[in-house]
Amino acid sequence: MEAGPSRTSMSPAFSRAVHGTRAVFGGALEWDGADALDPSAMAVTALGMGVPILIGVLIGRPNIGLAASLGAMWVGAAPRGASLKEHWRIVRDNVVAAIAAAVAAAIIAQHGPRSDVGLVLAAGAAALLGGFSRPMAVASQRFIIFATIGLGVAAHTPNRIALVVLIAEGALWAALCGLAIGVAARRFDIGSIVASERESTASFEQKFRHWRTMLRTWAAWSYPVRLTACLACAAAIRGAFPQHHYSWIAVAVALLTQRQSDNLIAKVSQRALGVAAGVVATEAIAIHPLPGWALVAIIAMLAALSPWLRNRSYFACTAATTPLIMLLTSGGETIGQGLLIDRLVATLIAAGLVITAFLVARRFMPRPSPDNRRPG
């Protein structure tokens, strides 16, 4: 009886496929329990998102509470700095990105095909500006994700100015919760403190010259080109199938596209699996009308789980965050099974777009010359 093919006889392509599959599913099942539970971070996100929706339910307008909770979600996850000054800087950047994204979404929304063009241009400009500095890179990625999510809400909102105000109020409320709980947590040594990064000593002129020089290289354009190409494809697919709810493709593209290309295929696949699992979980949560108290409890619970899962499991964190996003953008309406199936398909389409764009862009990246390779 002949033995099966040995490892040495496997083709390189098959070997890479096996290795990649192990990396994706192995990484999805990994669980890092080294970090201690941080009740302060969980309290910030639970109160930041739970209180606005509670107020909305109490006054009989859950959609108002959901809009404010959306702004809180964009800010509440800010890591706690070692000092109030450092914490304020982190929270301030998140608040600015959230409000700017809400304003951009309100301006771009409800203009037909021009809205798609506006999103692509705004996201591309933000991605390009993100190369100016590391803080700008972080802020630009937040802006892109927030604006894409916000556009989906603003597209179905009759009063977009009120939506911006509610999102801003939720963001400011979450910022106050974070700063207040942060002061108490530092005073009583509760939870963990994010490691502070050393601020750059380069002047604005030096950063600008460096950024302008980088714009002459493909590395500076790779992320903006990949992102805008995928968003344009997402808009085209949604327009080609108007009977489906494929606006989620753009949201998934914004969530899945990364500036850094290290292990991108494995990370995108893991996050796509997490989003798909989150969509399936949403069916169990919201396929039937939820009473007000249940909506508040579920949103507060999912919000509290997010910071706890963030450093433990990439897959589990994404799976918990996805129902949160879907509930907050639902306007308090029941999420039907057809919508969930469409969003599951949209997630897979987005993952395919992001990975394809990366593989195409990688062909244009300059290969390191043999002289520059380290020996050994």
Regions found by a protein language model. Name each.
Residues 1-143, 147-320, 328-376:
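Alpha-helical transmembrane segments and their membrane-interface boundaries
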